[in-house]
Every structure is written in C-alpha cells, then in structure tokens.
C-alpha cells in the first residue's frame, strides 16, 4: 500500500461505522488501479480491516489495550490531564491522526505502508 492509498483509506475510515461496508467499498476502490477482472488480494482486505479497527479506537480503548490509565496516558504523550479527561469522557474528541499516532507509539498499530 502506498502512502497515498493509506491516506485515502485512513480518511475514509471515519465515514464508516460498519467495518464490513468499509472493507467492501475500499477494497473495490479505484485507488488500487485494478482491472474489472482482477481479484482482490487477501492482504488488502486484512490491511483495510486493520486500518478501520485502528481508526475506530477511542482514547480509552487505546489506553486499555496498552495497559495504561488516564494519568499515564497524559504523561506519556505530554497532553494536559484535563484534555485527556475530556477525551476519556467523550466531552471532546481526539483527532484521528492523534489516535493513530498514539497507537503507533504504544506498539498497538503499524500502518501497512510499503
């Protein structure tokens, strides 16, 4: 997957609550340059599932997966505690880019970029 394809797939993930619909639509997207008779590679499907899973994770889910509490998350990412509280409670939303970077830094996610 190229960086441009990854960017498109990541940004599109926010538009889909249903992971299966996301995978289906993106697997068949024009971004791959597939011909009408080409089969969809299994690794593409797996990569898309992983992108959607990572994009859908909330900050509390990221913290839980990493075994960290709110105080540890705040310190680890140098984010004010109040901001982290707002992200945990849902009072404010954390950007997709920040959530993906948190997962990368914590070893929970590795973007499938060639």
Label each region the model flagged:
Residues 62, 71-76:
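Short alpha-helical "recognition helix" segments of helix-turn-helix
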Residues 93-114:
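DNA major-groove recognition helix of helix-turn-helix/homeodomain DNA-binding modules
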Residues 1-51:
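N-terminal flexible/basic segments that precede or flank functional cores
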Residues 77-94:
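Recognition helix of helix-turn-helix/homeodomain-like DNA-binding domains
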Residues 1, 67, 111-114:
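Short intrinsically disordered terminal tails
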Residues 48-68, 103-105:
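Short, amphipathic alpha-helical "recognition" segments used to contact nucleic acids or chromatin
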């Amino acid at each position: 997957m190229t960086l441009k394809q990854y960017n498109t797939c990541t940004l599109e993930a926010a538009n889909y609550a249903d992971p299966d619909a996301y995978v289906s639509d993106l697997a068949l997207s024009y971004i791959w340059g597939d011909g009408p008779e080409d089969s969809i590679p299994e690794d593409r499907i797996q990569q898309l599932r992983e992108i959607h899973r990572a994009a859908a994770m909330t900050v509390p889910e990221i913290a839980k997966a990493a075994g960290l509490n709110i105080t540890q998350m705040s310190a680890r990412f140098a984010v004010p505690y109040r901001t982290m509280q707002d992200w945990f409670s849902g009072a404010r939303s954390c950007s997709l880019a920040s959530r993906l970077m948190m997962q990368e830094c914590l070893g929970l996610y590795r973007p499938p970029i060639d």
